[in-house]
Amino acid sequence: MIEQLSNLRKSLLLIAAFLLASLHMTATNRDSLALTPPMGFMTWNKYKEDINEQLIRQIADKMATDGYAEAGYKYIFIDDAWQGGRDQRNNIIPDPKKFPSGMKALADYVHSKGLLLGIYSDAAQLTCAGYTASYGFEEQDAKTFAEWGIDYLKYDYCHAPSDSAVAHKRYKKMADALQNSGRKIALGVCEWGQLNPEMWARQAGGSLWRVSFDVRDMWKDIVKQGGMGIIDIINITEPLYKYAGPGHWLDMDMLVVGLDGKGGPSSDLGGVGCTYTEYQTQMSMWCMFASPLAVSHDILNENAETRRILLNKEIIAINQDALGEAAHRVDFPGACRVYLRNLSGNRQAIAIMNPSDTPQRVQLPLSILGNAKEYNFRDVWEHKTSRQRKVWQATLQPHETKVFTVTTR
């Protein structure tokens, strides 16, 4: 009897070890879908429901020929309002007026430009804007997306139960369906950070997960109606840095750079626009935290300052660094904040941010970087290199962020 119990115990341990190994292999395989944070253009903030295939083709042409693809922006993310219901076989279909050529033809066109195509659905029966969603049709929709040539699915959580176990189950069901669809399709968990997705989204199959409610085109939420400003999302993301890594990213939502208060949904709930200093801080901190980068401005009619911020290859290189670590905040007295991010090749990135409404003089002891006698500081926004010893000092304007890559001499 004792021997039988011993053998049973060994068998159970072997089964448990096998299941754990299988889960690890599954997570590892899914992680490979986004080894660096995805970059691209998302339709929602500027166009909301006013989208069509001609617009997507124009955006693809622009990205392929005017610096965006070269800088790393490979995706076009079609957000809500593309759906046209279901056909007689319950296959989800695009709106025939908006996408008369069909999604496969559009995906083929986007791919011909060297780009990737993302699409949107919801883990309920309806999307946030009231269109057909995928709950109950996960396997069927995943196969349809694969047949179309879709590369990424943003999966929202409107009209779904406010329960983390239910959310985990619904996202995992779609992730499994995508994995079995015959095509590699990354999954973006868009649950807005309310059910602690950092604890379960990766295990559910997500390549990234939202940390907050939707971003608005503003520095800070003052009206308190549910919109999130740039600094609000930074504050939420700060303590979550340990959850980020290759294939599983903290999604801080879209970049509002260049919207200038003229977007659609981004301009409600107090979203009156930002200064370009604030836009530059958003780009800086999204890159420091290794967030996906989804531009959302009028990309077909943009100004030079917007392009300067969004196409800066040095700040993008920090975002896309292969080590995949997110920045962490270090103790520093005063009104300014200091963030460090470890980079590949024995390098570091450091960001000094002034979140206050007044200029701040900063004297930063370089001992926080280590015990080297001298450092090379590369200013990624000014594109200048300097030697620094003991203390770095400067005056930062309100809401300004300085970012440097640092190497020892």
Range-by-range predicted roles:
Residues 280, 286-289, 294-296, 332-370:
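Carbohydrate-binding surface patches
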Residues 186-297:
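Glycan-recognition surfaces
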Residues 37-43, 72-79, 116-121, 151-156, ...:
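Structural recognition of the beta-strand scaffold that forms the well-ordered cores
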Residues 59, 63-164, 170:
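Aromatic-lined carbohydrate-binding/catalytic grooves of carbohydrate-active enzymes
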Residues 281-330:
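Catalytic cores of secreted or luminal carbohydrate-active enzymes
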Residues 1-29:
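Bacterial Sec-dependent N-terminal signal peptides
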Residues 387-409:
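C-terminal beta-strand-rich structural cap/linker in extracellular carbohydrate-active enzymes
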Residues 115-131, 179-196:
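Aromatic-lined carbohydrate-recognition surfaces of secreted/lumenal glycan-active proteins
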